[in-house]
Amino acid sequence: MVFPVAKLKILPTDALIIVDMQNDFMPGGALPVPNALSIIPAINRYIELFEKAKAVVVATRDWHPPNHISFNTRGGPWPPHCIQNTWGAQFHKDLKLPGDTIVISKAFKEDKEAYSGFEDTELDATLRQRGVRRIFVAGVATEYCVKATAEDGLRLGYQVFILEDAVKGINSPPGSEERAINNLIDRGAVAIRIDDIVAD
């Protein structure tokens, strides 16, 4: 993995993007990511660091209509999940999101899938309005929505950091999560952990 030489200081123009930490992706949900609960403490630590720095905190969420094109009931690859205004679409109760968290809903059109937090959303415009230049990506699933969000961030000109201790993948087939992170690094992202950030 590639790590920055010097420790990073979180700035007010940085954004933490927490991807899809919703009930349906947790144990007991419709589409659980293995061990997804294990990253919640790390994500909460990052939230504290970003709040202290007066940086931006974003939480993306799948926000599907009941007959979404991705559902296997319509020939898609996934069981119905994260349906609008249901328990499964809610953020997990242990996630300590600040009151001013920017919530970005994605994949809300019945006939269009969207893995990235940037696709068909106001995320890019919102970040630019706040002067954000660096994004730090956490959440699930590494090979899908985390990867797609990071890829779009790179394409849009942001400096992208993958928070390795705060992402979790499906990892099927085995090794797919590591390949996804390595692919992002090859494209210009930087993989870091919480110890790589200055806590002051």
Which residues does each predicted region cover?
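Active-site-adjacent betaalpha module
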Residues: 2-17, 29, 35, 41-54, ...
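Short acidic, Gly/Ser-rich segments with clustered Asp/Glu that frequently serve as metal-coordination loops
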Residues: 22-28
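Feature marks short, surface-exposed loop/turn motifs that line or immediately flank catalytic pockets
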Residues: 25, 66-67
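Catalytic-core segment of enzymes that process non-peptidic bonds
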Residues: 61
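Short aromatic-enriched loop/helix-cap "lid" or pocket-rim segments at secondary-structure transitions
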Residues: 69-73
